[in-house]
Amino acid sequence: MTGLRTDKALRDDRIAVDAPLTWVAKSSSKFIAANERVLFFLFLFTLPFVNPWVRGDGVGYYAYLRSTLIDHDLRFEKDYLSANESFVISRADPQGHLLPRMYTKTGYVDNHFSVGPAILWAPVMLAVHGSVLLADRFGSHVAANGYSYPYLLAMALTTACYSFLALFLSIRIAQKYFEAPLTLLATVGIWMASSLPVYTYFNPSWSHALSAFTVALFLWYWERTRLHRTTGQWAILGLVAGLMGNVYYPNVILLIFPALEGVHLLFPRQRDGDPLVVSIQKSALNCGVFVATFFASLIPTFITRWIIYGSPFETGYPAISTWNWTSPVLLKILFSADHGMFSWTPVLILAVVGLPILVKTDTLLGVGSVLTFLAFYYFIASYPDWAGISSFGNRFFVSLTPIFILGLAALLSSFAKWLGRTTRAVAIACPVLALLILWNVGFIFQWGTHMVPARGEISWSRMIHNQFVEVPLRVTHDCETYFTRRGEMMLHIEQEDIDHQEIHGDREN
């Protein structure tokens, strides 16, 4: 019937937007399983670096889970007053009471951090809470208060697992378009040479690694079902999109992908004199289902905003009208000594350069990735606290980890074609990425031990001196301390943070 797209037409249309070529998938199939095993074993090797603590922004994210699970309310006084001292000193008076400014008009404690991380942690934490209560009956006497070690360890390991899933789903997407060795290099390169390790291992209670997972899940499902998605699959995509927004509000920018797909389906290319069109009624139904499930999935955010702020649409962040929309810091956000994305994590330069190449590989995926990055870039550059206050690199862009992996894989693939052999490209790319990873690990070490300030601009001359002189001298001793006397080390780092705040008047987010 006129206006209805057949299955064959859908398959043809997928080819028309440069779907992954069959020869790529076949030539890489024997390496894909090996890729995923390597990624998994690398992940297992890094697990001892997981740091089970709740600190800074993580206090707000974790409070939703702990307060709901243990106290059965959204009263966060206990969470805030029990937090790390550098978090408390700017929020409480000398008598140990939260300052009046910490309360909203509804009488609840201001908690502008998103509820999404608590949703992702909840299944594991419910099991842990039940286990702690059960163990208590047998005389274990572990405090079932959400602060004891089993809870913190479970939270940290859960975050690490979600971070790994972000990488796993990202490499699954990339392997459809590029040769397996190149996708493994791209994935490991972005994983280890970006800001992701800080929010996977050192600060697992923050939202960024979890955000990367939800973006990867959304992109993976969108790519897997695009152009032939059923109404039910549109509903699932809407739910995943809502989860993505619950975890990190700017992630809704990723809706660019289904929007582009919708435009393509409504205005497809004409073939053999027979234009392929989609029923307007069918498109409207799918769009309605997607929007409905998207907003339904956001209900946890709407409810918590309503309770805390009195409106489901109040976020607690600076009003959009106060943002720097007409004067975004487009260069500073990339190159500033104050957590510039490219200056702190230069591997992302390669990833962004690869995004236009991705357009040539697959139009929808490539254009969606480019537009998403540009929109995200402008959005964060317009945000008053664009540098992230306390941040390694520009932490806001950790959400785009899957897109960066695709961009780097596209660049490596183009390089391999230029050289004429994949093995040559791998041989050259491996040492380059290894150097970027070593540089990043040394930089993270400096940042974590406060050899460079966690807030504000750093001195590049001092940082470079540290990389070549101080880091090699200290790394063995400090790593030993991290694994054998971690609590003592964290207290020392916390005290340094307090001293820095008192001197410079800095604040937590």
Kindly give the residue locations of the regions a language model identified.
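Membrane-lumen/periplasm interface segments of specific transmembrane helices
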Residues: F257, H264, P268, A284-P356, ...
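Membrane-embedded, lumen/periplasm-facing catalytic core of multi-pass transferases
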Residues: S390-S391, A429-N509
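Transmembrane alpha-helix segments characteristic
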Residues: N35-L42, L185-W191, L239, V289, ...
